[in-house]
Regions:
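HhH-family (HhH-GPD) DNA N-glycosylase catalytic core used in base-excision repair
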Residues: 1-254
């Protein structure tokens, strides 16, 4: 029964991968050569991609890096030497009068940003590229390193790893696809619980039980599940009648 459900999800991945609107779901050829500024945008995007739409988070990250903490060539050094009260004002009002972080991250982001600057300077030479500059056999280190930064939990660390390896060819790119595991964000957990692949939506349960799926490419499976969660499997009133895996779902009302 699990095989039927997993196959339905992977079939949806194949459908998505053929659609240019979902080009981010495909594995990219070659490796992206990040400038330091683009690397800073990526890291801030990871920090902000919680409690708000992904599109807003990544646009906000670009705006923050391009418009603040740029009095020197060292973005993280400028953050580290800026008083927390000033950082808080920028973070909560500096995005065209609005906050960069929303909801539960609104008050946490300023302090997390300053603490992250300290860690970035001490361990990675003020350069996020050093976080993911690893060989293919050490792809797991990307996840482990992101997880050490305040405000970046399991799901965000895994998302960062997926994006870097899949979309930017870091750590061997597609050759490392079997060495990763799914990211247990709220959308993925909801879909897996409802479809009947896990017994609970709790993060530790999802992570443990997903290891038993025998996935050849956890990142592809994860991407398809995430899209299903975002576009069909809503928290309230899910669109089961439109869901591409409804026939394989234990909870679908079609």
């Amino acid at each position: 029964m699990f095989a039927t459900k997993i196959n339905a999800i992977m079939q949806h991945y194949e459908t998505l991968a053929e659609n240019d609107a979902y080009d981010w779901i495909r594995w990219k050829d070659g490796r992206t050569r990040f400038s330091k500024k683009v690397a800073n945008r990526f890291f801030i995007g990871v920090m902000l991609d919680q409690g708000q739409k992904a599109e807003r988070a990544w646009n906000a990250a670009e705006y923050l890096v391009d418009n603040y903490f740029n009095t020197s060539e060292d973005f993280w050094g400028d953050i580290a030497t800026t008083h927390l009260a000033r950082i808080k004002k920028i973070c909560q009002t500096g995005y065209e009068g609005k906050s960069f972080a929303l909801n539960y991250s609104f008050n946490k982001f300023p302090r997390n940003l300053k603490s992250s600057a300290k860690l970035m300077i001490e361990k990675y030479g003020s350069d996020p590229r050093n976080i993911w500059n690893v060989r293919a056999e050490n792809v797991y280190q990307i996840y482990d390193r992101f997880l050490l930064f305040p405000g970046i939990g399991d799901a965000l660390a895994k998302m960062a790893q997926f994006a870097l390896v899949k979309n930017h060819g870091v750590a061997g790119g597609i050759s490392s696809k079997s060495e990763m595991s799914i990211k247990p964000d709220i959308l993925v957990r909801r879909v897996l619980r409802r479809v009947g692949l896990v017994s609970s939506g709790q993060t530790n349960v999802v992570v443990a039980q997903a290891r038993e799926f025998g996935l050849s490419s956890p990142a592809d499976f994860d991407a398809a599940v995430w899209v299903i969660g975002r576009e069909y499997c809503f928290k309230s009133v899910p669109a089961c009648n439109k869901c591409p895996i409804a026939l394989a779902c234990d909870s679908a009302s079609v």
